[in-house]
Amino acid sequence: MERAADADETARIAALLAEAVDAGAFGFSSTILNQHMGFGGRPLACRNASRDELKTYANVLRDRRKGAIEVALTRQIGVLEEDQCEVLDLLLEESRRPVTFIALFDRDDISEAVRDTLKRAAPMIAKGARPQTSPLPLTREIDMRSPFSFAAFPSWKRVFADKSPEAQK
């Protein structure tokens, strides 16, 4: 799906989320990262979620007073940008539940990225935001059969958009 859910779809998804949380689900996860794609190179549906849609799902957890949210939030590893802070704050305020976000890794090219992100996120961390990281170095194996890592770059958009059999080889 390459659009945000409409009001009816959002209500149905919220009802399913409520049912799942009541049955023991931990909460929900989402992503805004360009490289998180689904079938045929299309964006995962949650990538297109509107603020109203996210608010509705967060309210499900608030109303039940349980659950947590995990969100893949940083388009640049280790760098929390202003619009991402707004999403994080919205989820915290509307859910009143813990929200964990990825990804904080030390970077050779932006040595202060994690420190700056933690400073920027401090008010939200005080409200229950929890950044995620890894004790291991970030490494990637890349080949053209699974070019996942390139999806974050606008210059690769046409490659992922080409659905022809020739392009998919």
Language-model segments: which ranges?
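Polyanionic/metal-chelating signatures
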Residues: 1-8, 16, 21, 43-44, ...
